C-alpha cells in the first residue's frame, strides 16, 4: 500500500491535555506527594517545571498523575524491558541420535555432547532409531537409554522415558537439574 496514512501508535499513558479527569492525585518530579489538585493546576505545575503531566494509574479514584519528562520515562521503560529480555534464557531442546548398536567410542562422544548441552542449561532429546531387524531387539534399545540415563544421573533429570516404541524410534527427554 503506497502513500497510506501512517497511524501514530497509541500511547500507553495519557499525557497533558489528553487526561480527562477534573481532579487528579499529583506526584511531583522527585516522587513527593502533592495531594489532590484540579487538572488545570496540575498542568500549570508541570508547565512551570518544563515537563509533562503523565497519567500513571487512570483507574484510581482520582487518577494518579506524575510530573515528569515523558520521553525520558519511555526511554527508561524500554531500557528496563530490554534488560529483562537479556536476563531471560531461552531453553533449547538439543537432539542426539543413537542406534541400538552404537559402539563405545561413539557412545562416549555423544555422551560428552549431552553433558555439554545439559551444563549449558538446554534440554536434551535422545532419539534411539531402529532399522530393519533391530525392531525385533527393542530390549537392547531400552538398555542403551537406561545406560544414558544412569551415566547422566548427576546432571539431568528424566522428563519423559519411552514406555513403548513410537514408529521406528524411542525418544527420551532429559532436563538439567536445578543448581542449588
From Swiss-Prot:
IF-3 binds to the 30S ribosomal subunit and shifts the equilibrium between 70S ribosomes and their 50S and 30S subunits in favor of the free subunits, thus enhancing the availability of 30S subunits on which protein synthesis initiation begins. Belongs to the IF-3 family. Monomer. HAMAP family: IF_3. It is found in: Cytoplasm. This is Translation initiation factor IF-3. GO terms for molecular function: ribosome binding; translation initiation factor activity. One of its GO terms (cellular component) is membrane. It comes from the Bacteria. The keyword Protein biosynthesis applies. GO terms for biological process: ribosome disassembly. Keywords: Cytoplasm, Initiation factor, Protein biosynthesis. InterPro entries: T_IF-3_C_sf, T_IF-3_N_sf, Translation_initiation_fac3_CS, Translation_initiation_fac_3, Translation_initiation_fac_3_C, Translation_initiation_fac_3_N. Its main location: cytoplasm.
Amino acid at each position: 500500500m503506497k502513500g497510506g496514512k501512517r497511524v501514530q501508535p497509541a500511547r500507553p499513558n495519557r499525557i497533558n491535555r489528553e487526561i480527562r479527569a477534573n481532579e487528579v492525585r499529583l506526584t511531583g518530579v522527585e516522587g513527593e506527594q502533592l495531594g489532590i489538585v484540579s487538572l488545570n493546576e496540575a498542568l500549570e505545575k508541570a508547565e512551570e517545571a518544563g515537563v509533562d503531566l503523565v497519567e500513571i494509574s487512570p483507574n484510581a479514584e482520582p487518577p494518579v498523575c506524575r510530573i515528569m519528562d515523558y520521553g525520558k520515562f519511555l526511554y527508561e521503560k524500554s531500557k528496563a524491558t530490554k534488560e529483562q529480555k537479556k536476563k531471560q534464557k531461552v531453553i533449547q531442546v538439543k537432539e542426539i541420535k543413537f542406534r541400538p548398536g552404537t559402539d563405545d567410542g561413539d557412545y562416549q562422544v555423544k555422551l560428552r555432547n549431552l553433558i555439554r548441552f545439559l551444563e549449558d542449561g538446554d534440554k536434551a532429546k535422545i532419539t534411539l532409531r531402529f532399522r530393519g531387524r533391530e525392531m525385533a531387539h527393542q530390549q537392547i534399545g531400552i538398555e542403551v537409554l537406561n545406560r544414558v540415563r544412569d551415566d547422566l544421573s548427576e546432571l539431568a533429570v528424566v522428563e519423559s522415558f519411552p514406555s513403548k516404541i513410537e514408529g521406528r524410534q524411542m525418544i527420551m527427554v532429559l532436563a538439567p537439574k536445578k543448581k542449588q
